[in-house]
Amino acid sequence: MIKRILFWSILPFGIPQGLLLRRNALRFGAAPGETFGVIGNGKRISLVAIGDSIVEGVGAGRADNALAGATAKHLARILEAEISWQAVGKIGATSLSVLKELVPLLSKNPVDVFVVSVGVNDVTSLSRTGRWAAHLTNLFKSLRAHSPKATIVMVGVPPFGRFPLLPKTLQLAFGMRGKTFDVVARQIIQQMEGVIHVPLDFDPQPEKFSADGYHPNAKSYSEIGLAVAEAIAAKPS
Protein backbone atom coordinates (compact mmCIF):
# COMPACT_ATOMS: atom_id res chain seq x y z
CA MET A 1 0.00 0.00 0.00
CA ILE A 2 2.76 2.46 0.98
CA LYS A 3 4.75 1.72 -2.18
CA ARG A 4 1.64 2.22 -4.30
CA ILE A 5 0.95 5.60 -2.69
CA LEU A 6 4.59 6.64 -3.14
CA PHE A 7 4.57 5.57 -6.79
CA TRP A 8 1.48 7.57 -7.71
CA SER A 9 2.76 10.52 -5.65
CA ILE A 10 6.14 10.61 -7.37
CA LEU A 11 4.95 9.86 -10.90
CA PRO A 12 3.50 13.31 -11.76
CA PHE A 13 6.94 14.86 -11.23
CA GLY A 14 8.42 12.44 -13.74
CA ILE A 15 5.85 12.95 -16.50
CA PRO A 16 7.53 16.04 -18.07
CA GLN A 17 10.86 14.21 -17.99
CA GLY A 18 9.24 11.18 -19.58
CA LEU A 19 7.77 13.22 -22.42
CA LEU A 20 11.14 14.83 -23.11
CA LEU A 21 12.80 11.44 -22.96
CA ARG A 22 10.32 9.94 -25.40
CA ARG A 23 11.10 12.75 -27.85
CA ASN A 24 14.90 12.62 -27.64
CA ALA A 25 15.90 9.06 -26.71
CA LEU A 26 17.83 6.80 -29.07
CA ARG A 27 15.58 4.16 -30.60
CA PHE A 28 17.02 0.86 -31.77
CA GLY A 29 15.10 -1.69 -33.77
CA ALA A 30 15.07 -5.46 -33.52
CA ALA A 31 18.43 -7.16 -33.97
CA PRO A 32 19.10 -8.27 -37.56
CA GLY A 33 19.33 -11.94 -38.49
CA GLU A 34 17.30 -15.11 -38.29
CA THR A 35 14.96 -15.45 -35.32
CA PHE A 36 15.33 -19.22 -35.19
CA GLY A 37 18.09 -21.78 -35.31
CA VAL A 38 19.55 -25.05 -34.09
CA ILE A 39 22.66 -25.40 -31.95
CA GLY A 40 24.47 -28.27 -30.26
CA ASN A 41 24.36 -32.05 -30.50
CA GLY A 42 22.47 -34.67 -28.53
CA LYS A 43 18.91 -34.98 -27.35
CA ARG A 44 16.72 -32.46 -29.22
CA ILE A 45 15.00 -29.83 -27.09
CA SER A 46 12.72 -27.16 -28.53
CA LEU A 47 12.78 -23.69 -26.97
CA VAL A 48 10.64 -20.66 -27.78
CA ALA A 49 11.21 -17.23 -26.30
CA ILE A 50 8.13 -15.01 -26.39
CA GLY A 51 7.65 -11.43 -25.27
CA ASP A 52 9.00 -7.92 -25.55
CA SER A 53 12.10 -6.16 -26.93
CA ILE A 54 14.45 -8.52 -25.08
CA VAL A 55 13.09 -11.29 -27.28
CA GLU A 56 13.41 -9.04 -30.33
CA GLY A 57 17.06 -8.47 -29.42
CA VAL A 58 17.13 -4.69 -29.15
CA GLY A 59 20.74 -3.84 -28.32
CA ALA A 60 22.01 -7.38 -28.94
CA GLY A 61 23.70 -6.65 -32.26
CA ARG A 62 22.49 -9.90 -33.83
CA ALA A 63 19.28 -11.87 -33.40
CA ASP A 64 21.11 -15.00 -32.25
CA ASN A 65 22.65 -12.98 -29.40
CA ALA A 66 19.19 -12.11 -28.01
CA LEU A 67 17.29 -13.96 -25.30
CA ALA A 68 16.35 -17.09 -27.26
CA GLY A 69 19.70 -17.57 -28.98
CA ALA A 70 21.77 -16.77 -25.89
CA THR A 71 19.75 -19.19 -23.76
CA ALA A 72 20.01 -21.89 -26.43
CA LYS A 73 23.80 -21.58 -26.65
CA HIS A 74 24.26 -22.04 -22.92
CA LEU A 75 21.61 -24.75 -22.62
CA ALA A 76 23.18 -26.77 -25.44
CA ARG A 77 26.51 -26.70 -23.62
CA ILE A 78 25.13 -27.44 -20.14
CA LEU A 79 22.83 -30.29 -21.19
CA GLU A 80 24.97 -31.51 -24.10
CA ALA A 81 21.82 -31.31 -26.20
CA GLU A 82 20.62 -30.06 -29.56
CA ILE A 83 18.50 -26.96 -28.97
CA SER A 84 16.02 -25.87 -31.61
CA TRP A 85 15.18 -22.26 -30.75
CA GLN A 86 12.81 -19.57 -31.96
CA ALA A 87 12.08 -15.98 -30.94
CA VAL A 88 8.53 -14.63 -31.11
CA GLY A 89 8.72 -11.04 -29.96
CA LYS A 90 7.38 -7.54 -30.39
CA ILE A 91 8.97 -4.29 -29.29
CA GLY A 92 6.73 -2.60 -26.72
CA ALA A 93 4.77 -5.76 -25.94
CA THR A 94 2.85 -6.01 -22.67
CA SER A 95 1.60 -9.17 -21.01
CA LEU A 96 -1.80 -8.59 -22.64
CA SER A 97 -0.45 -7.99 -26.15
CA VAL A 98 1.76 -11.08 -25.89
CA LEU A 99 -1.33 -13.09 -24.97
CA LYS A 100 -3.55 -11.59 -27.67
CA GLU A 101 -1.07 -11.05 -30.52
CA LEU A 102 1.96 -13.31 -30.12
CA VAL A 103 0.59 -16.54 -28.67
CA PRO A 104 -1.66 -17.00 -31.74
CA LEU A 105 1.50 -16.84 -33.91
CA LEU A 106 3.01 -19.94 -32.29
CA SER A 107 3.31 -23.11 -34.32
CA LYS A 108 0.78 -25.75 -33.36
CA ASN A 109 3.62 -28.12 -32.46
CA PRO A 110 4.19 -28.34 -28.69
CA VAL A 111 7.55 -27.17 -27.36
CA ASP A 112 9.72 -28.27 -24.46
CA VAL A 113 10.60 -24.84 -23.04
CA PHE A 114 9.01 -21.39 -23.12
CA VAL A 115 11.07 -18.39 -22.02
CA VAL A 116 8.81 -15.41 -21.28
CA SER A 117 9.91 -11.77 -21.10
CA VAL A 118 7.17 -9.34 -20.07
CA GLY A 119 6.68 -6.67 -17.44
CA VAL A 120 8.74 -3.68 -18.52
CA ASN A 121 6.03 -2.25 -20.75
CA ASP A 122 3.31 -3.13 -18.24
CA VAL A 123 5.16 -0.94 -15.74
CA THR A 124 5.82 1.96 -18.11
CA SER A 125 2.25 1.89 -19.46
CA LEU A 126 1.04 2.32 -15.86
CA SER A 127 -0.88 -0.94 -15.75
CA ARG A 128 -2.56 -1.69 -12.42
CA THR A 129 -1.21 -4.59 -10.39
CA GLY A 130 -4.54 -6.41 -10.62
CA ARG A 131 -4.51 -6.27 -14.41
CA TRP A 132 -0.87 -7.33 -14.48
CA ALA A 133 -1.68 -10.35 -12.31
CA ALA A 134 -4.69 -11.33 -14.42
CA HIS A 135 -2.91 -10.94 -17.76
CA LEU A 136 0.19 -12.80 -16.58
CA THR A 137 -1.87 -15.65 -15.17
CA ASN A 138 -3.81 -15.97 -18.43
CA LEU A 139 -0.58 -15.88 -20.43
CA PHE A 140 0.88 -18.76 -18.45
CA LYS A 141 -2.36 -20.72 -18.79
CA SER A 142 -2.38 -20.14 -22.54
CA LEU A 143 1.20 -21.38 -22.90
CA ARG A 144 0.39 -24.40 -20.76
CA ALA A 145 -2.62 -25.19 -22.97
CA HIS A 146 -0.37 -24.97 -26.02
CA SER A 147 2.32 -27.24 -24.57
CA PRO A 148 1.07 -29.18 -21.52
CA LYS A 149 4.49 -30.64 -20.67
CA ALA A 150 6.59 -27.53 -21.28
CA THR A 151 8.81 -25.86 -18.73
CA ILE A 152 7.85 -22.18 -18.60
CA VAL A 153 10.54 -19.73 -17.50
CA MET A 154 9.77 -16.10 -16.77
CA VAL A 155 12.61 -13.61 -16.80
CA GLY A 156 12.10 -11.25 -13.88
CA VAL A 157 11.24 -7.56 -14.19
CA PRO A 158 14.56 -5.70 -14.50
CA PRO A 159 15.94 -3.11 -12.03
CA PHE A 160 14.52 0.13 -13.42
CA GLY A 161 16.15 2.04 -10.59
CA ARG A 162 19.53 1.86 -12.30
CA PHE A 163 18.63 2.27 -15.98
CA PRO A 164 21.07 4.94 -17.27
CA LEU A 165 18.51 6.39 -19.69
CA LEU A 166 15.92 7.21 -17.03
CA PRO A 167 15.99 10.47 -15.04
CA LYS A 168 16.22 10.03 -11.27
CA THR A 169 12.51 10.62 -10.69
CA LEU A 170 11.53 7.89 -13.14
CA GLN A 171 14.24 5.59 -11.80
CA LEU A 172 12.67 5.91 -8.37
CA ALA A 173 9.05 5.59 -9.52
CA PHE A 174 9.52 2.76 -12.01
CA GLY A 175 12.08 1.08 -9.76
CA MET A 176 9.50 0.74 -6.98
CA ARG A 177 6.78 -0.31 -9.40
CA GLY A 178 9.00 -2.86 -11.09
CA LYS A 179 9.82 -4.51 -7.77
CA THR A 180 6.12 -4.67 -6.91
CA PHE A 181 5.28 -6.27 -10.27
CA ASP A 182 8.09 -8.79 -9.82
CA VAL A 183 6.74 -9.79 -6.40
CA VAL A 184 3.29 -10.31 -7.93
CA ALA A 185 4.83 -12.46 -10.66
CA ARG A 186 6.67 -14.60 -8.10
CA GLN A 187 3.45 -15.13 -6.14
CA ILE A 188 1.62 -16.29 -9.26
CA ILE A 189 4.45 -18.60 -10.28
CA GLN A 190 4.60 -20.22 -6.84
CA GLN A 191 1.05 -21.45 -7.40
CA MET A 192 1.79 -22.98 -10.81
CA GLU A 193 3.51 -26.26 -11.55
CA GLY A 194 6.32 -26.24 -14.10
CA VAL A 195 6.80 -22.46 -14.09
CA ILE A 196 10.11 -20.92 -13.01
CA HIS A 197 11.03 -17.33 -12.13
CA VAL A 198 14.56 -16.20 -12.97
CA PRO A 199 15.31 -12.89 -11.23
CA LEU A 200 17.27 -10.17 -12.97
CA ASP A 201 19.18 -9.24 -9.84
CA PHE A 202 22.44 -8.31 -11.58
CA ASP A 203 24.36 -5.13 -10.73
CA PRO A 204 23.10 -2.80 -13.50
CA GLN A 205 26.22 -0.76 -14.19
CA PRO A 206 26.16 1.54 -17.27
CA GLU A 207 28.53 -0.78 -19.15
CA LYS A 208 25.90 -3.53 -18.92
CA PHE A 209 23.59 -1.60 -21.26
CA SER A 210 23.52 -0.93 -24.98
CA ALA A 211 24.05 2.58 -26.33
CA ASP A 212 20.40 3.50 -25.70
CA GLY A 213 20.89 3.16 -21.93
CA TYR A 214 17.77 1.03 -21.64
CA HIS A 215 18.35 -2.39 -23.20
CA PRO A 216 21.07 -4.97 -22.47
CA ASN A 217 24.17 -5.20 -24.63
CA ALA A 218 25.34 -8.49 -26.14
CA LYS A 219 27.38 -9.42 -23.06
CA SER A 220 24.41 -8.85 -20.75
CA TYR A 221 22.14 -10.88 -23.03
CA SER A 222 24.62 -13.73 -22.66
CA GLU A 223 24.56 -13.39 -18.86
CA ILE A 224 20.76 -13.43 -18.82
CA GLY A 225 20.73 -16.42 -21.15
CA LEU A 226 23.13 -18.26 -18.85
CA ALA A 227 20.91 -17.62 -15.81
CA VAL A 228 17.87 -18.90 -17.70
CA ALA A 229 19.72 -21.96 -19.01
CA GLU A 230 21.00 -22.85 -15.54
CA ALA A 231 17.47 -22.59 -14.13
CA ILE A 232 16.13 -24.88 -16.86
CA ALA A 233 18.93 -27.40 -16.34
CA ALA A 234 18.41 -27.41 -12.56
CA LYS A 235 14.69 -28.19 -12.83
CA PRO A 236 13.93 -31.82 -11.86
CA SER A 237 12.92 -33.97 -14.82
Which sequence ranges carry the predicted segments?
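Alpha-helical cap/lid subdomain in secreted, periplasmic
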Residues: 103-237
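Short, flexible loop segments at the rims of nucleotide/cofactor-binding pockets, characterized by
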Residues: 25, 90-94, 173-174
